[in-house]
């Protein structure tokens, strides 16, 4: 069975979707022949997107899988043979007027109606999608993101004197301003995976917080960053999934994350949950992990069990089941 995976044209430093489905393709059963179709053009402007749609139309397989971001190409594929993955709907945040209309209809409503199966990466994303497309629940299947097998347990002596807090991501939803207010005055170092904005650097200097910035790392380098830290921070205001929670679980690091969106679902009792809009709540959570050795070790133990839910073989088998069902129709 030939399954064609349709990917956006990859931009520098933006490779999460591609890495995810490369893992899936590598782990699919032998009866599935996966092919990748990367768009020749970036998803920018009407004519480039139209060319992407035409490329998709002429590249179809027995089953088609639109893997995210370029949802609109679904409109040019055979409806009964197409799977659409929607990772999150955060791109709708703050939109209004014409941009809201275009995103709603060409990225959500019409693509959702013009495919046989929609896969989403969390129950939170499923519930949000249903609000935009009432009546779509029957075609939505939740398939979690897998954790790479590069993330393996590595014991580390916890640094009680000067712990390293690893913050994954620096975009607006990552809630950096409140995190910095929360760790102000704590004897720690903050590692940031992602490029810091000028305002964030100013706050770091204003609060006299020691930090290091890491950008454009390979997967292997990211793994080493997890291994080098003592605590992982992921107190986002919204997330479609939250893979860093599971990556930290798999390595064996305690996590503080948010009590909203998909994060409690992904954490599954393996992280300390905080209110991301409350600086004091974030500070208390971090302080609890730093100070309470028994609590921290229990979170780590829970994390190892939680990570088992995101094994790549299980995830690939779930996708394979979807492909077989569509192929048989």
Enumerate the language-model features and the residues they cover.
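Conserved acidic donor-binding segment of nucleotide-sugar-dependent glycosyltransferases
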Residues: 257, 272-279, 287-293
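Carbohydrate-associated surface elements
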Residues: 124, 146
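Short hydrophobic beta-strand element within catalytic cores of glycosyltransferases
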Residues: 245, 253-257
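Nucleotide-activated donor-binding/catalytic signature segment of Leloir-type glycosyltransferases, i.e.
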Residues: 194, 200-223
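Conserved donor-binding/catalytic core segment of Leloir-type glycosyltransferases
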Residues: 158-174, 180-184
């Amino acid at each position: 069975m030939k399954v064609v995976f349709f990917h956006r044209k990859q931009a520098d430093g933006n490779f999460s979707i591609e890495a995810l489905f490369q893992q899936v393709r590598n782990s699919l059963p032998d009866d599935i022949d996966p092919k990748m179709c990367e768009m020749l053009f970036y998803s920018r402007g009407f004519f480039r997107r139209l060319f992407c749609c035409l490329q998709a139309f002429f590249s179809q397989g027995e089953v088609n899988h639109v893997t995210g971001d370029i949802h609109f190409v679904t409109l040019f594929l055979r409806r009964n043979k197409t799977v659409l993955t929607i990772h999150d709907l955060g791109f709708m945040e703050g939109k209004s007027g014409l941009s809201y209309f275009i995103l709603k209809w060409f990225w959500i409503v019409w693509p959702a109606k013009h495919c046989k199966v929609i896969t989403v990466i969390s129950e939170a994303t499923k519930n949000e999608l249903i609000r935009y497309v009432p009546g779509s629940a029957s075609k939505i299947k939740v398939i979690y993101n897998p954790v790479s097998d590069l993330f393996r347990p590595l014991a580390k002596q916890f640094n009680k004197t000067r712990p390293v807090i690893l913050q994954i991501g620096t975009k607006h939803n990552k809630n950096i301003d409140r995190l910095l207010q929360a760790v102000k005055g704590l004897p720690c170092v903050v590692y940031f995976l992602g490029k810091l904005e000028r305002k964030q650097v100013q706050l770091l200097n204003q609060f006299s917080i020691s930090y290091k910035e890491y950008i454009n790392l390979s997967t292997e380098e990211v793994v080493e960053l997890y291994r080098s830290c003592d605590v992982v921070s992921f107190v986002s205001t919204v997330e479609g999934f939250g893979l860093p929670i599971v990556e930290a679980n798999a390595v064996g690091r305690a996590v503080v994350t948010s009590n909203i969106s998909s994060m409690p679902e992904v954490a599954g009792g393996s992280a300390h949950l905080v209110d991301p809009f409350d600086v004091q709540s974030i500070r208390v959570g971090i302080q609890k992990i730093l100070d309470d050795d028994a609590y921290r070790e229990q979170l780590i133990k829970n994390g190892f069990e939680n990570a088992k839910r995101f094994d790549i073989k299980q995830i690939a088998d779930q996708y394979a089941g979807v492909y077989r069902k569509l192929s048989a129709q």
